[in-house]
Amino acid sequence: MRWAVLGGGHWGTALAVYLLRQRHMVQLWGRRAERLPCQPGRTDLFPVFPECARPEGLHCTVDLAAAVQGGEGIVLAVPSHALRGLLTHLLPCLPSTALFVLASKGLEVPSALRLDQVLREILPEAPLVVLSGPSFAHDLMLGKPLAMTAASTDPTYAQRVAEAFGSAQMRVYTSDDVAGVCLGGAIKNVLAIAAGISDGLGNGDSARAALITRGMAELHRLGTALGGRTETFMGLAGAGDLILTSCSDLSRNRRVGLGLGSGLSLEAVLRGIGEEAEGVRTAQALFQLAQSLGVDMPITEQVYRVLFEGAAPRAASDELMRRALRSELHVSDDGTPGGAARTE
């Protein structure tokens, strides 16, 4: 297939190189030429992967129309806040039959829309598959095995992406739960910040395990309230991605939490990371959704308070530990397991 990968960061570059290794034709697009990993005269993937050799046949461009011309598939790998603008600019030059693969994670702020919903507002009829799961660009670049989920309301599109991306390195499962796969990939980033804060405070491995487990309860409560399915949240796009992002220092969201828990300001942490950490923006949208839907999300609420209200990380951690005691399998007044309705 002929693919256009839109997004010249680590994830977009890794996906472009991976597709090239699977013998697809690939154009990699980015907004700024100096940030694209195809610098003239260089044989590596500077600046995103300077330690990796540039594969023969990888083409880079800042011309959006040229990138998608003749494309059979378009991979979207841009930050959540850039997606709407990119799609709007894409409209005049869009190939009529292109299959979209949404590989970005997050929620739009301030609308709190899922990213597939953003795409549907602009391209309501476009064939769409959401590709998500526990995966780091670094692992993909180094040829390490991983598994992902390809979700679409049309099973033929999901199968087409599974076949295009699937290999001995990447196992791709299919799903029809687009909402659940999108939400799992977004919510886990905020919970990973919480895990990082806990570790930055020195709370230990036991506390991290508790946060991940109770974070899964929050992911399930909000995710099902927004139309996702339980089995999705227990799978690769939910629990799998949450575990990876919460436990590995390759995770930018975890590193945000580590910095905050160690006493750094948010500005200093983000400056040190130097790249987008989707969980920061997503925390705003999740807090907004939880409040409007009456969903109990105490971990998310404390992350929001640390990020945007100046709450001290230690005080936020202590607040979680001092919550009123209740059954782990709490059922709310509306009969929803886990307390879908807010309970004080």
UniProtKB/Swiss-Prot annotation:
Alphabetical GO biological process terms: carbohydrate metabolic process; glycerol-3-phosphate biosynthetic process; glycerol-3-phosphate catabolic process; glycerophospholipid metabolic process; phospholipid biosynthetic process
Binding residue positions for sn-glycerol 3-phosphate: 105, 133, 135, 188, 241, 251-253
Enzyme Commission number: 1.1.1.94
Record localization: Cytoplasm
Residues reported to bind NADPH: 11, 31-32, 105, 137, 252, 278
GO cellular component: cytosol
Annotated protein name in UniProt: Glycerol-3-phosphate dehydrogenase [NAD(P)+]
Source organism (scientific name): Acidithiobacillus ferrooxidans (strain ATCC 23270 / DSM 14882 / CIP 104768 / NCIMB 8455) (Ferrobacillus ferrooxidans (strain ATCC 23270))
